[in-house]
Structure formats: structure tokens, C-alpha cells
Amino acid sequence: MSTGRYAPSPSGRMHLGNLMCCLLAWLSAKSKGGQVLLRIEDLDTQRCPRSYADAIVDDLAWLGLAADGPTPPVYQSDRSEIYQRYFDELSRRGLVYPCFCSRSQLHAASAPHRSDGQVIYAGTCRGLTPAEIAERSKTRAPAWRVQVPDEVIAFEDGHMGHYEENLARDCGDFFLRRADGVFAYQLAVVVDDALMGVDEVVRGSDLLSSTPRQLWLYRELGLTPPKFYHLPLLLASDGRRLSKRDGDQSLENLRAKYTPEEIIGKLAFACGLQASPAPATPQALARTFDWSQVPKSDIVLPENLF
């Protein structure tokens, strides 16, 4: 039985982009007779109040996309001790080191950058001696990075096809824990998906480039990776990427204007799952769902669809 998951970050109310990901995760799992679990990705508790998490649970139930468990959902903010064990495993093997670089140093014009604008860490702190680490620790708490190999990690995405990266060249040593002690997304998501028994992950294509480093972490930690399906991004009619700041596209406002079936039907139409924006239920869509129906390029919402 396939096990998918929702993994929302409760930094605001859900918008249509979040909903598209949840809908396709639900359809992908249910079309295989599977289940969908819920995990709340609230590592940064200052930005992720529980009230937003409660609203997400309510929104999903109202739409007919309620998770199959667990109850209550898994909260990443409750799992620091678990992440610490896996962090310590990598540290014991000499793969983790402290990084004292400031944000301005990391984003200096001379720093190598990816094509998407992300900084590739140059390894500035990788070779610090114990004495240098002790001296720098007097004035600045370090973040912690993991050292990646000069190795190509490739995989076949269930929707986007072949993707690969050379970790050293295209990714660089990445954060496992912030200076304030909060564990990084890259470590937490790998540990959680493995321990929850998730075997398929549906998420946005903005996370496609995170997958090689996560697959490497799965391997290094002796964990079984899921099958990945990366989605096109959902854009507003003017080409903007939807965000939680787009109040008019939030579920809070959409619930006041439409029924659940109307929202699902309009979104299914935008995703290529049906020929018109007629009202639909997730259960009806699951009976005919196939990944070949979903575009690979970004989806622009037709004007006045919502």
C-alpha cells in the first residue's frame, strides 16, 4: 500500500498552490489504494503558530482531503531529540563541522551561485583547526554543516523524469542545524519521511534541487528513500508565484465564496485533470487520476477562475 504525506509549513493560511500539492498527493496515493499522513513542518516555532496548523487540518477536512493519520499529526517542533540522534551519527563519522560565516559573507558577490540564485557554500570553515573553532566560538555561535562528496547523485522523478546533481559542485556543504539550535529542513524531512514509512513524496518543483542532497542523506543514514513526484508551480494569472501573502487566494477567503466541490473542480481543471472547471470531489477524480494528465511546466491560473 502506498503511503504519501502532507507536510505543510503553518506560517500562514493555505493558498491554492499548497492546495494543489495536497490534492495531487491525495490523488496519487488514493489512486493506488494507499493512505496519506499529515506532518506539520513547524521547525521555526516563531513563524509557525499552532493556530495556523489547526486551520490547515480544518481546511483539509472541509475539502474532503483529510489525512488518514496520525492523530494528532506529527509536529516537527516536538522531534528535536530524534533529529539530534541522526545529527550525532553524521558527526561521529566526521562529516559535520561548525560554520561561523555571517549572512553577508555567504551572500557576497564573489561567492559561487547556482543558476537559481542560491549560494553554493565555498567551504570557508571546513578546515578550521580546533583552536580556531574555540576562538571563534567566543564571539559567535556556529551553525553546523555537513560535508558532501564530489559525487553525482541521480534519480528518476515520478513526474519530471531524470534529474542529477554533483553535490560538491552544484550544492555544496549544506546546513544541518542553525546557530540557534533549530534543525534544518534537509535533515528533518529525511528523518521524518523515513520514520513515518512514507514511500512517495509529492511536492513542488522548487524542491527538485533539494532531492539529490536528501537522497545522499538517506544513504548515509541507512534509511530508505521514497519515490519523488515534483509538481509544476502554480502561478497567478499575471505570472506571479502564489504565496501566503495573496490573501484573495487563501483558503480562508475561498471558503467564503465557494463550496469544497467548486474549489476542487476548478483546481482540477487548472491541473489538467478534467476538461472543465465543473464541481468535483476528490473521490471521483481519484478513479481516473494519472500523472500523465498533469503538466510539467508551471501552471498559470486562468484569469477569473477563482
Name each model feature, range by range:
Residues 15, 77-83, 137-140, 186-191, ...:
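Noncatalytic linker/hinge segments flanking ATPase motor cores
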Residues 32-33, 64-68, 102, 126-127, ...:
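Short, surface-exposed, polar/charged, turn-prone segments marking secondary-structure boundaries
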Residues 104-243, 250-254, 303-306:
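Active-site cores that bind ATP or allylic diphosphates and position pyrophosphate for catalysis
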Residues 1-13, 31, 36, 134-135, ...:
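Non-catalytic terminal extensions that flank enzyme cores
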Residues 1-114, 205-206, 210-223:
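N-terminal Rossmann-like or analogous alpha/beta NTP/dinucleotide-binding catalytic cores
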Residues 52-53, 57-163, 167, 278-306:
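Active-site neighborhoods of enzyme catalytic cores
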